[in-house]
Amino acid sequence: PEQPFKTLSAVNALTLNPGDRVLLARGCVFENQYLHLRARGTKEAPVAVESYGEGALPHIKASGTGLWYQNYGQPLDNPNHVWHGYVSSAVLLYDCEYIRLRDLEISNDPGLLPGERYNQGDKMNRTGVAVVAQNRGTLHGITLTGLYVHDVKGNVYDKHLANGGIYCVCQKPEQENGEIARYEDLHITRCRVERCSR
């Protein structure tokens, strides 16, 4: 665009194509915002989401926003294990490939609501970054580098749903005859993860 976007919701509405770059200004804090992308680059021209300028890393501060629905498609081996439900993610890469996230600060801590406890059983599931493969078979070339992910307070009981600092998962395809979801060339480098719980 000729003018910079003021919110991440404008970025979420885009279809990102090979070679596209989303540049977030250093020193900016995206309060109560999230970045949920469905982007497909190529090996020669990956999609890039990264910082520019000088100063502190751009901070995506979800604070409990960015809800999406995780569903494994069938009950798990233990009836006590939760296999579907809502998750709050500051950054969600859903069926993305050939994409690079670099030099971002990410957090997702809304604080405790009145009457809520840290270890409450029905507490919201939360991630800093969630990478989900489901309906496109093998996803290639996903790189997370130089991320500072911190203060993500998820549900300490729902171990099968997305919870924690950086969470990558393959789910059952929605189509019965869909190709099995998997990753190839998924790289997580130089990332710092602090004060995160599942």
Roles of regions detected by a PLM:
Residues 15-17, 40-43, 53, 136-138:
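Extracellular/periplasmic catalytic domains that process cell-envelope and extracellular macromolecules
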Residues 34-37, 67-92, 115-135, 157-183, ...:
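Extracellular beta-strand/beta-solenoid scaffold signature
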Residues 1-25, 29-31:
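Acidic Gly/Asp/Thr-rich repetitive segments characteristic of extracellular carbohydrate-active
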Residues 11-12, 36-40:
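Short linear motifs in intrinsically disordered
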Residues 23-30, 38-118, 151-157:
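Right-handed parallel beta-helix/beta-spiral solenoid domain characteristic of secreted/periplasmic
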Residues 46, 50-55, 97-108, 137-153, ...:
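Right-handed parallel beta-helix
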Residues 2-5, 95, 138:
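Soluble non-cytosolic domains of exported or imported proteins
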Residues 20, 33, 45-47, 89, ...:
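The right-handed parallel beta-helix/beta-solenoid scaffold, focusing on the short coil/turn
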